[in-house]
Amino acid sequence: MNEQVLIKALVEHAYLEGDFVLRSGRRSRYYLDKYRFETVPELLGALGERLAIAVAEHEPEVARLAAPELGAVALAAAASLASQLPFLIVRKEAKGYGTSNRLEGVSESGELVCLIEDVVTSGGAALQAVETVREAGLVCRTAICVVDREEGGSDELARHGVRLWPLFRASDLLGQVKSVVNPHG
């Protein structure tokens, strides 16, 4: 799927207009519903391939991927299959049973990890995941997301030593909204 076709598909499947409160607490007139694009096999596969390519380009020495639950796990799994890199699941909090881990999967201290994210707004969720990964003794200096909403998340991550590489920026998608929502002008 080429870039323009993928952008159009993301807008068709995931772009919603209304009054939304984002995870960051900010209000927005539009919402990119990640579950609407992560649950479509063709889109998930195409995104997994693009994420794998981006990982190879921006963090070629990476040992494994990591993804915060729940939203980015499907993306990390798709990228893992495309890249043949193992991945970790970063829990928001330790579960009260079993291993009680916040980081699920197998890793070795000192390994280089690339964070996979869905939509980044303020960078808060990504930063929490990076902190969990680092507390486990792993190195994380790169995050790759499907969409950067261009609302400060990249700068916030950079302040903590993490470079954000988006597959798309919100402006890429919003430029397609008019033609997709109202194709006849």
Regions found by a protein language model. Give the residues of each.
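PRPP-associated nucleotide enzymes
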Residues: 1-116, 120-185
